Design a protein with these regions (language model features):
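Viral virion structural and adsorption modules
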Residues: 1-88
């Protein structure tokens, strides 16, 4: 299995996600409940992100009460994932 964000990812727990924005830092976790270990990482469904803390601003919780859906994944030439977030 190719590792997703090796510095943040572990086999046992979802990856912690840190988003730096103008309004503060948002902490989230991947929901990996639909992860299929029989498939390579690039064939996995898009994972949702559940926000678990918004220390500086609560606007994002109001706009996205169930977390941010459908982050945009980029498969780069080094076969590692990078990610971008669509907040609008």
């Amino acid at each position: 299995m190719r590792h997703f964000l090796p510095s943040l990812y572990t086999e046992a727990e979802p990856a912690d996600i840190v988003m730096e924005t103008a309004k503060g830092t948002y902490i989230g976790k991947f929901d990996r409940s639909n992860y299929d270990n029989s498939k390579p990482a690039e064939q996995q469904p898009i994972w949702s992100i559940k926000l678990v803390a918004t220390p500086n601003d609560h606007t994002i919780q109001t706009l996205y009460p169930n977390g941010i859906k459908n982050p945009i994944f980029v498969w780069d030439q080094k076969e590692s994932y990078q990610y971008k977030f669509a907040l609008s």
